[in-house]
Amino acid sequence: MNDNHSWFFTEALMNEEVSQPVVAAEASAPLGLREQSKREVTRRIRAAAVDLLARKPFSEITTREVAQHAGIGEATLFRYVGSKDELLTLAYGDRMDALLDELQSADDLATEAVGAEGAGEWYCARVRSFYEGRAAFYLQDPANAALYLRQGFDMTSAGRARTIAQGDRLIERVRSILAEGQAAGALLSRVDALSVAQNCHGIFIHEVDRTPTRGFEPSTIWQRVHARLNAQLDPLVIEPPL
């Protein structure tokens, strides 16, 4: 156990008495009620983390604050999350899944509205709309959103697999859009659709990362991502014959 975890668990043990009612209730409850209790505690922890992250940077939040905000003791908190970093995953993971669901549903509706293959620019616009949505999500809380995104690159992060899976999900959707355009003869087929999709995702991650290091205003994130996506996508468009 590293020093950070030791410190977290030391504080948790100091607050063990606060969590006893919750623990006792779960131990004596029927399986169905026990599962309901666990889900309710998880919901309260998630809500507390989301609320606190909306108020201040992740680095300034303590596990004691989260536990108090959720109405539980720290010992109970650490029965649901193994480290402070997992609170970031808990707070952002479901929200990111919901965002991707929303963006995919919007793309499905747009596809149904067209009813047939569109021009090359239409496929490119569909790709851009996904990253415009990601940029809007980032702007809700740039510092904490960037931390969540970086979990995918941290080999020690408990949230790494989920963050990577969400990125892969978006990459696959973009790949399928580009492949549709190629099959329709609207986009150049000699370019590998998966490579382009990975490049598009890399553009977004790079712009998030270099926002603080280059001193860029977070509000310019979509302007920067949009310009680079255009440079990647526009050359693929096959102009229809006159």
Spans of features found by a protein language model:
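Amphipathic alpha-helical segments used for helix-helix packing
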Residues: 137-158, 209-213
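C-terminal peripheral helix-coil segments that are non-catalytic and often amphipathic
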Residues: 1-29, 136, 140, 172, ...
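Key DNA-contact positions within bacterial/archaeal DNA-binding proteins
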Residues: 75
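Amphipathic alpha-helical packing segments from all-alpha helical-bundle domains
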Residues: 100-103, 147, 157-184, 194-198, ...
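Amphipathic, non-transmembrane alpha-helical scaffold segments
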Residues: 38, 42, 46, 88, ...
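Hydrophobic alpha-helical connector segments
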Residues: 90, 104-143, 193, 197-200, ...
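Basic, helix-initiating cap at the start of DNA-binding domains
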Residues: 1-56, 60-69, 86
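An amphipathic alpha-helix adjacent to DNA-recognition modules
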Residues: 39-47, 54, 59-60, 71, ...
